[in-house]
């Protein structure tokens, strides 16, 4: 980046920081992983959270749910030092952080999924995630990638601003206050909860209510008349998908999973776990309060008593709950997401025409209570896949876990088909290290090779004829996880690893080498997640 552009980028980020009310870190800084007592929906419990101040400091006035915002600019080098200060043995005490949506080109060791690219970080230790973001911008997030730890609270938004954003003329305001996070929340800590539990509530920007619970404060998003806001919607869900809308307002969608798209106007968005959208809202309605709605597909649905809701408040409106009603007729369809730049899938425009074609048949084993892909559940290996590769293993046959590793050669077009056969769908599948082109979407029987949606999380659908199909090019060496982003499903096996161009994988820093010996020496008490007998 030339000096003038770097100065502009720095000023841009400073303005975002200045106008955003929320604490933020980045592109360098300490992220403290601590246990904090929280009550985001009126129910008090301990949680695992990410914040900008250590455990020894006073608890922030605002609970650390969601976690601290990380932000920077396109072209930045991110140096995020994760400091583990966890002490509550009822939840996991070790941790590992995934920076969702980043390619990690040349830094697969920093991708974060435990036992795929690293061993977890022990309590009392720290680990520096150091990675470059030369050519990505948009809306991302981060979360624990160790077992189901992020369901206990360790998740937060991550925004990379682009001073040369091609959509810049469409909005006036884009800062920390225009980030909208959606979370499912549980009153029982994950290690003690059911294998696939039902959420107790929905949190919007860390606040919500549960059915039959107290009238807890809801998140308020403030706007001024006639201004245009770029809202960044992030689903940090462990399970449900949400149907999102704002009463009386249309949503001009301009980004999906950090990919700029041809703008499209809708009035509702179905968003699955791990997905992100940016939309522009023009505050052109009467000065009033308007309901923001995020209706989950499971748990307590609807909006009675203010559940699954937040408030859009115009400057000058009374501080009251809205009385507005919902009327939506134009939902966002994935098949209408057209990339703004370089649309089109790689490879010949025929199904099965890629260099490598893989069918992933998902199923549920009622005997073992495991979800499988091609008959095999993903069981985390003792040694991370990356460590195995660096130690000399290079073929699918020699890598563990057996049956869950798929070796991919460099510079090949890969086509993955995922028929919707497994129970518990729709399954939102996320591929690490890449975006992909969705040449066949859920609910569609046609293939689109010319203008397919490009993203990093895709819903596999539930229809008997659904066969979601994606394509990508193997241009990024590393062991890349492909998994269901319903965290409870990942925990019982719904994942595979693509060992891509293994001979070109970059070596990790020396501190990475220390993670496994430290972790392997820990006692069960040090690892946490102890379930009372």
UniProtKB/Swiss-Prot annotation:
InterPro entries: Cu-oxidase-like_N (IPR011707), Cu-oxidase_2nd (IPR001117), Cu-oxidase_C (IPR011706), Cu-oxidase_fam (IPR045087), Cu_oxidase_CS (IPR033138), Cu_oxidase_Cu_BS (IPR002355), Cupredoxin (IPR008972). It is found in: Secreted. One of its GO terms (molecular function) is copper ion binding. Cu cation 3 binds at residues 145, 432, 483. Cu cation 1 binds at residues 98, 430. Binds 4 Cu cations per monomer. N-glycosylated at Asn-467; contains a high-mannose glycan with a varying number of mannose residues. The lineage of its organism: Eukaryota, Fungi, Dikarya, Basidiomycota, Agaricomycotina. GO terms for cellular component: extracellular region. Cu cation 2 binds at residues 100, 143, 485. POX2 isozyme is the most abundant laccase of P.ostreatus under various growth conditions. Its cofactor is Cu cation. Residues 25-171, 173-336, 382-501 form the Plastocyanin-like domain. Disulfide bonds join 119-516, 151-238. This is Laccase-2. Keywords: Copper, Disulfide bond, Glycoprotein, Lignin degradation, Metal-binding, Oxidoreductase, Repeat, Secreted, Signal. GO terms for biological process: lignin catabolic process.
């Amino acid at each position: 980046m030339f000096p003038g552009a770097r100065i502009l980028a720095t000023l841009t980020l400073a303005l975002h920081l200045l106008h955003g009310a929320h604490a933020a870190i980045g592109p360098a800084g300490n992220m403290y992983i601590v246990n904090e007592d929280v009550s985001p929906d009126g129910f008090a419990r301990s949680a695992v959270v990410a914040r900008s101040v250590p455990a020894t400091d006073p608890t922030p006035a605002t609970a650390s749910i969601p976690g601290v915002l990380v932000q920077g600019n396109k072209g930045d080098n991110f140096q995020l030092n994760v400091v583990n200060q966890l002490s509550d043995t009822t939840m996991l005490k070790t941790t590992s952080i995934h920076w969702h949506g980043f390619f990690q080109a040349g830094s697969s060791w920093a991708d974060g999924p435990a036992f795929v690219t690293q061993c977890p970080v022990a309590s009392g230790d720290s680990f520096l995630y150091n990675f470059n973001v030369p050519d990505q911008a948009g809306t991302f997030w981060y979360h624990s990638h160790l077992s189901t730890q992020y369901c206990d609270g360790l998740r937060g938004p991550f925004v990379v601003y682009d001073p040369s954003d091609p959509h810049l003329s469409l909005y006036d305001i884009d800062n920390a206050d225009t980030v909208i996070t959606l979370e499912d929340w549980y009153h029982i800590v994950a290690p003690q909860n059911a294998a696939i539990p039902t959420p107790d509530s929905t949190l919007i920007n860390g606040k919500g209510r549960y059915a039959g619970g107290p009238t807890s404060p809801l998140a308020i998003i403030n706007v001024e008349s006639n201004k245009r806001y770029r809202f960044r919607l992030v689903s940090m869900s462990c399970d449900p998908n949400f149907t999102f809308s704002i009463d009386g307002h249309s949503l001009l969608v301009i980004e999906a999973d950090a990919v700029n798209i041809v703008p499209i106007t809708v009035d509702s968005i179905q968003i699955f776990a791990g997905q992100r959208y940016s939309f522009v809202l023009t505050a052109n309605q009467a000065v009033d309060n308007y309901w923001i709605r995020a209706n989950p597909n499971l748990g307590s649905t609807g909006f009675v008593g203010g559940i699954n809701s937040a408030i859009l408040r115009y400057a000058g409106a009374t501080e009251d709950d809205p009385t507005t009603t919902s009327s939506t007729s134009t939902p966002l369809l994935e098949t209408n997401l057209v990339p703004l730049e370089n649309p089109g899938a790689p490879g010949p425009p025929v199904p099965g025409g890629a260099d490598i074609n893989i069918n992933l048949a998902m199923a549920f084993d009622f005997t073992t209570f495991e979800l499988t892909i091609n008959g095999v559940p993903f069981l985390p290996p003792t040694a991370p896949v990356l460590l195995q590769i660096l130690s000399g293993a290079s073929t699918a046959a020699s890598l563990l876990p057996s049956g869950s590793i798929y070796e991919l050669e460099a510079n090949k077009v890969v086509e993955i088909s995922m028929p919707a056969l497994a129970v518990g769908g729709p399954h939102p599948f996320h591929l690490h290290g890449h975006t992909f082109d969705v040449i066949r979407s859920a609910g569609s029987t046609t293939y689109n090779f010319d203008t397919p949606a490009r993203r990093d999380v895709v819903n596999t659908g539930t229809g008997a004829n659904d066969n979601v199909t994606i394509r990508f090019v193997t241009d990024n060496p590393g062991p890349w996880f492909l998994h269901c982003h319903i965290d409870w499903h990942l925990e019982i096996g719904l994942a595979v690893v693509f060992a891509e161009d293994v001979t070109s994988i970059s070596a990790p820093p020396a501190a990475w080498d220390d993670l496994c010996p430290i972790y392997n020496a820990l006692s069960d008490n040090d690892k946490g997640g102890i379930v009372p007998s």
